[in-house]
Design a protein with these regions (language model features):
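A cross-kingdom feature marking charged/low-complexity
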Residues: 169-187
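Short, surface-exposed beta-strand-loop junctions and turns on beta-sheet-rich folds
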Residues: 33-35, 99-101, 173-176, 312-315
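C-terminus-biased signal that marks the final domain/tail of proteins
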Residues: 11-26, 34, 39-40, 147, ...
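Catalytic cofactor-binding cores of redox enzymes
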Residues: 141-175
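Proteins synthesized as precursors that undergo proteolytic processing into mature forms
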Residues: 111-145, 149-150, 257-266
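A contiguous strand-loop segment
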Residues: 12-113, 150, 334
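N-terminal signal peptide c-region/cleavage motif recognized by signal peptidases
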Residues: 7-9
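Short hydrophobic/aromatic-rich beta-strand segments that constitute the beta-sheet cores
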Residues: 27, 93-95, 177, 305-308
Length: 351
């Protein structure tokens, strides 16, 4: 199955990036899909593993590629469709939906040996590149085509061990790169538009709003956080981008990577979309517990990937440094062995 967004336009992704006092980078994000269970899996890919890309029409007839580096990623629908992950060199990559704004070049069967599908660009890059510079060079040598021309386009973010992050958008068949010092990414419109839109909120600031004397009255805010009164609270990509940018700007820089990872999960709690709010009133609500199907955080310096899911909010971790990508075999497993939230009972002491 290919995710065809034209048939169910209820999707969203929010990405943030934090840094520790020592300069380590944590790239985190949510993935939302309110249409059905994405049947997500974690995929372990060793060095030397060979894959072939899908091309429009559903055939595995595109570029053949072999991994130079091992990586672990999270996939949707098919194990080949890794949408976020990190490799052993500390390169993180992820795709975000980009509907109605992007447009790839048309697929040419004569160029199939250098054509990679949009939904397989992440695994190809993770297996080939160690730095953002290498990513930009590699992408320039291939044709990125749609896995399913009925579906949405996507855009991508890439973060390397130095902390540098770039966003790739393909518009009119042209590859456009954006440096992302802000560290935020959502969906449409284009990345440049989101940056300009932040100017509409230059009056906002973290903390308590100041009081005001008016007509002999002393006005004061009802509670803390009044400096952000008016920040957009809906679930559209522009509003999520603004909220994420301001939440990041107010977040303290922490000393340890693990604390920073937990901070990323706390920030992304604000983008956990309940099921039903993205579904039209005349459409049946899918039988899943949340539109936010999983949240992942890549601790780049320590080569650790943390995740939780809509079924189990327990945070789990892969340690890439402890993984031998020469000896390990290719593997693909569901993110949740059991699709049910575990509950730990606390025994009340009676004496």
């Amino acid at each position: 199955m290919v995710i065809c967004l034209s048939s169910f336009p209820a999707y969203a992704c929010t990405g943030i990036t934090l840094r520790t006092e020592g300069g380590n980078t944590v790239a985190a994000r949510t993935i939302e899909w309110a249409g059905s269970d994405l049947e997500s899996r974690y995929v372990v890919v060793p060095r030397g593993y060979t894959q072939r890309s899908y091309v429009p029409g559903g055939k595995k007839d595109g570029m053949l590629f072999t991994s130079r580096y091992g990586y672990i990623g999270l996939s949707v629908e098919r194990a080949e469709y890794v949408v976020d992950g990190m490799n052993e060199k500390g390169l993180s990559a992820g795709l975000f939906y980009f509907p109605d704004c992007g447009s790839y070049e048309r697929y040419d069967a004569l160029e199939r040996d250098s054509s990679v599908s949009d939904l397989q660009l992440v695994p190809w890059i993770l297996g080939q590149c160690s730095t953002v510079d290498e990513v930009m060079s590699a992408v320039g040598r291939v044709h990125v085509v749609s896995a399913d021309e009925r579906g949405s386009t996507v855009h991508w973010r890439f973060t390397d061990n130095s902390g540098r992050q770039v966003v790739l958008e393909i518009v009119g068949g042209r590859k456009m790169w954006h440096e992302n010092a802000l560290g935020v990414l959502t969906n449409s419109p284009d990345f440049g538009w989101h940056l300009k839109n932040l100017n509409n909120y230059a009056n906002l600031y973290p903390g308590r709003a100041s009081g005001l004397e008016i007509g002999g009255m002393h006005l004061k805010p009802f509670g803390g956080g009044g400096g952000l009164y008016g920040i957009p609270g809906d679930m559209t990509p522009p509003s999520r981008f603004v909220r994420a940018a301001f939440f990041l700007s107010a977040a303290p820089c922490l000393s340890s990577s693990e604390e920073t990872v937990m901070q990323a999960f706390h920030i992304l709690n604000n983008f956990d979309l309940p099921i039903g709010v993205q579904t039209n009133m005349d459409v049946a609500v899918p039988d899943i517990p949340s539109a936010t199907q999983w949240t992942v955080a890549c601790d780049i310096g320590n080569r650790r990937i943390y995740y939780r899911t809509m079924y189990d909010s327990t945070i789990r971790c892969f340690d890439l440094k402890a993984t031998d990508f020469v000896k390990v075999k290719y593997a693909s497993h569901p993110l949740d062995a059991v699709k049910r939230q575990p509950v730990r009972f606390v025994k009340v002491q009676t004496d």
